[in-house]
Amino acid sequence: MTVKVVEGDFLQGASAKYAIVVGRFNSFVVESLLEGALDALRRHGVAESQITVYRAPGAFEIPLLAQQVAVRTKPDAVIALGAVIRGGTPHFEYVAGECAKGLGQVSLQSGIPVAFGVLTVDSIEQAIERSGTKAGNKGAEAALSALEMVGLLQQVGE
């Protein structure tokens, strides 16, 4: 007897429709995340006509916009991008926690994969490193996660 293993790949998601929800706050970092995500999708055969970018004011607003996009436009996946940088107040914990929790709820309630590309970092330097320099581009990684999940969900139940 052989165990069946189901895994996603990056090819099955090429014909899918993607929504990218981007927080504008900390735009100097977020724009690099967006470019990374768009580049990753294009490199894997996703046409620009299959991608729509929605801009939220900041990370706290991303979950609601992602939820409405999921419900109203029914993309195959949502890619959430933003940057929350720790400061001297508890604001970071509130925004980062609610954003992560909200996006998880959107995914579970809608049945649409939501890839988490929202940086939650301690410093501007860490944000820059994770948006295309030393630590790669987390926007590109989120796009690859979305591609893989689309392919994986297509196989569930086959």
Curated annotation (Swiss-Prot):
5-amino-6-(D-ribitylamino)uracil binds at residues 25, 59-61, 83-85, 116. Keywords: Riboflavin biosynthesis, Transferase. The keyword Acetylation does not apply. Its EC number is 2.5.1.78. Disulfide bonds: none annotated. It holds the Pfam family DMRL_synthase. InterPro entries: LS (IPR034964), LS/RS (IPR002180), LS/RS_sf (IPR036467). GO terms for molecular function: 6,7-dimethyl-8-ribityllumazine synthase activity. It catalyses: (2S)-2-hydroxy-3-oxobutyl phosphate + 5-amino-6-(D-ribitylamino)uracil = 6,7-dimethyl-8-(1-D-ribityl)lumazine + phosphate + 2 H2O + H(+). Signal peptide: none annotated. Pathway: Cofactor biosynthesis; riboflavin biosynthesis; riboflavin from 2-hydroxy-3-oxobutyl phosphate and 5-amino-6-(D-ribitylamino)uracil: step 1/2. (2S)-2-hydroxy-3-oxobutyl phosphate binds at residues 88-89, 130. One of its GO terms (cellular component) is riboflavin synthase complex. CDD domains: Lumazine_synthase-I. GO terms for biological process: riboflavin biosynthetic process. It is an enzyme of class 2 (transferase). The active site is at 91 (proton donor). HAMAP family: Lumazine_synth (MF_00178). Catalyzes the formation of 6,7-dimethyl-8-ribityllumazine by condensation of 5-amino-6-(D-ribitylamino)uracil with 3,4-dihydroxy-2-butanone 4-phosphate. This is the penultimate step in the biosynthesis of riboflavin. Forms an icosahedral capsid composed of 60 subunits, arranged as a dodecamer of pentamers. Belongs to the DMRL synthase family. This is 6,7-dimethyl-8-ribityllumazine synthase. It comes from Hahella chejuensis (strain KCTC 2396).
